[in-house]
């Protein structure tokens, strides 16, 4: 099968969810044509989110170790290629599609950290999300900085969301994550003007501290301002109380 030509044909039809499309996505992931799959993924990432074909991203992990090695070799390419490779590699880690040794893991993380400082907001956004999937305790301070100082509201939101991912994955102990993020989350709730970012920060606090302020993800996604502000006030009091208890104990 000529995967590129078949992709273009299906794309011209709007990439419909049909048996034909599903068979194409399955065959692409099981093929040895990793480069074409990556090229198609890069083309999809240039499309608006609502126009992207399903399965192109998810199916890449089917290439296993060979796909991982190909992506590692693309991390030093220009920024739009490198961020696509880094994002896919991070998803590899989450899906456990193949094992990366310590050196390979360090290479992935180093590339994501480099991309997190790029001028292009979309590149920073995707790298910050991916850092949440694969980052360690050492990366918390970098996420803290982006949470409080990044000029892009989604970069700030995804920095908070990365703490949530770290907490859910249990790669970092909850006591460490709480201690290293509490101050920045307090400052975020005090100063953040973007409702979505503030809502994501509250969701993160609910997860990392295993508590609830009555804020649902659907309320954040639909920007229910009153619900977000009400939960934010509760979360701020909660974290400040945690601070005062720690100060008293010390």
Model-derived segments and spans:
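Structural signature of alpha-helical solenoid repeat scaffolds
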Residues: 61, 90-94, 132, 164-165, ...
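HEAT-repeat alpha-solenoid elements in large eukaryotic scaffold proteins
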Residues: 41-50, 82-92, 117, 157-163
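Alpha-helix N-cap/helix-start positions at coil->helix boundaries
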Residues: 15, 49-50, 65, 79-83, ...
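Amphipathic alpha-helical scaffolding segments comprising HEAT/armadillo-like alpha-solenoid repeats
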Residues: 1-5, 28-44, 63-76, 95-115, ...
């Amino acid at each position: 099968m000529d995967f590129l030509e078949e992709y273009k044909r299906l794309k011209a039809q709007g990439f419909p969810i049909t048996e034909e499309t599903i068979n194409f996505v399955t065959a692409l992931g099981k093929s040895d044509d990793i480069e074409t799959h990556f090229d198609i993924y890069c083309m999809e990432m240039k499309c608006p989110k609502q126009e992207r074909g399903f399965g192109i991203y998810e199916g890449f992990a089917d290439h296993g170790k060979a796909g991982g090695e190909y992506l590692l070799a693309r991390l030093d390419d220009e920024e739009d290629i490198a961020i696509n490779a880094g994002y896919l590699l991070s998803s590899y880690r989450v899906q456990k599609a193949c094992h990366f040794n310590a050196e390979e893991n360090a290479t992935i993380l180093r590339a994501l950290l480099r991309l997190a400082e790029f001028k292009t907001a979309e590149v920073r956004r995707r790298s910050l999300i991916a850092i949440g999937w694969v980052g360690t305790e050492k990366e918390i301070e970098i996420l803290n900085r982006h949470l409080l100082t990044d000029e892009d509201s989604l970069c700030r939101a995804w920095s908070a969301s990365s703490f949530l991912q770290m907490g859910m994955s249990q790669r970092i102990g909850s006591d460490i994550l709480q201690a290293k993020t509490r101050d920045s989350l307090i400052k975020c709730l005090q100063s953040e003007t973007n409702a979505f970012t503030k809502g994501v920060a509250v969701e993160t606090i609910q997860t990392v501290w295993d508590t609830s302020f009555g804020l649902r993800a659907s309320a954040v996604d639909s920007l229910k301002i009153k619900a977000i502000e009400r939960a934010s006030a509760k979360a701020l009091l909660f974290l400040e109380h945690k601070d005062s208890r720690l100060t008293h104990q010390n």
